[in-house]
Amino acid sequence: MKNDKVTPKKEKPKENLTVEQKVRREIIAWFWVGLVFLLINGAIGQARVIPSGSMENTLLIGDHLIMSRVGYDAGIPFTNMHVPLWRNPRRQQIIIFKPPFDPTQPDYVKRAIGLPGDTVDIHDNAVWINGQKLIENYTLGKTERIENSDVKMPYKVPDNCYFAMGDNRQNSYDSRFWGCVPRNDIIGTPIVIYMSLNASPEAWQPGQIGERFLAYLNGIIHPGTVRWRRLFHVF
């Protein structure tokens, strides 16, 4: 007869770790998680929050975005340095960039309207590119020139530059005021809205840590302040 007995597998001896060893293991594990997050956050993508209404109604105050840097810019972790890459914005694509007139300010979010070499003009409540009217179904308010601006129309976009405008045309500080955005200042484009809170605009201004904390706390206590329909909108 065949031997039907099954030889039991030997169990691996359990690790008898001290509390100190367990704590050390957890710290090391979370260290690597944090390091990977920082590398991804700096080099591949970043989170952004919309502090103003210049892109309404495409983007609302309190919209929280994930920005992709892939192909546009490589951030160097733990530094403020960045390296422009190979990808260039398409016409009418939303872009995120360092303000060329003051790179120390928070990043701007606008729409790329004029590409390098384009001639941009504004009249009859519309943007004209190289003599052709640009079809725009996302704007809010009248599209007008800025009187007494140093940017004169028609405007020839220089090489390696982009003419950027906010969708909220009467409430946007954009290329009509200060000229083009150099390609090297463009760091990415939004890919998804992961959170949107209807809170005081002051909460989303730089340095308003207390106000921002209260906005998040209020969102937890009062879920009605979350704009649920905007969540996970993909660009």
Model-assigned labels for residue ranges:
Residues 2-26, 43-49, 54-235:
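Soluble "head" domains of membrane/secretory-pathway proteins
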Residues 28-43:
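Hydrophobic membrane-insertion alpha-helices, especially the h-region
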